[in-house]
């Protein structure tokens, strides 16, 4: 595939694990057996037991279910880092979310609203657009005639931030829809197509194209990563955000 992390096969999949601590390693004082925690690992979470570095383990609020905790890790962590650190999204700005009904897209919609942005989501079907609206999007658009629709929805001004986990043809539409000094976030390539960018669009709009590699952020800025998680947990506890879980299995 095109994803940048490629562990050697065979390997156990899964990045998020939540449960109670069984044992702690030497020098670990912030956790003890019985604590409710969630952990992030590079892979191997789909197992009965998981070992994780203490810097990747986080204490859970008593009211947070384990499945919600897992949901908040990768997809929500990616969207939060993208909008908080990479885009520096501000209240009152307009946020465009491509792939709005995907896991990171739905997270970006909710986080954008929590920050105070106006959110325009894009998704490929009526059902998916309904999911975007349920997650808080102010507007949900199809990909067809997207360029004209964005002009209409922004009064010709464009969007301040575009969140793109899809790539492909929609990337250029987003690049053309940027407001002056807008920030176009390169989050992923779910379409399977890594797009090319006409650099003159960046020049003319004085916009920025900003990469988002959450896995690298987690490894290089663990203290800020922990701070991000605290904000997500606080929002969840206060019902500012709500995860969307399709199905849970024992």
What label would you give each PLM region?
Residues 76-77, 99-106, 164-168:
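Glycine-rich NAD(P) Rossmann-fold beta1-alpha1 loop
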Residues 97, 113-173, 221-227:
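Adenosine-nucleotide cofactor-binding segment
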Residues 123, 169-241:
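Glycine-rich phosphate-binding loop and adjacent beta-alpha segment
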Residues 63-85, 99-101:
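A glycine-rich, Thr/Ser-enriched phosphate-binding loop motif common to dinucleotide/cofactor-binding enzymes
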Residues 41-54:
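A structural motif shared across PLP-dependent enzymes of the aminotransferase-like
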Residues 36, 94, 118, 182-183, ...:
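Short glycine-centered segments of the SAM/dcSAM-binding site in methyltransferase folds
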Residues 2-44:
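Glycine-rich beta-strand-centered segment in the early N-terminal region that forms part
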Residues 32, 62-67, 88-94, 156-157:
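Short helix-loop-beta connector
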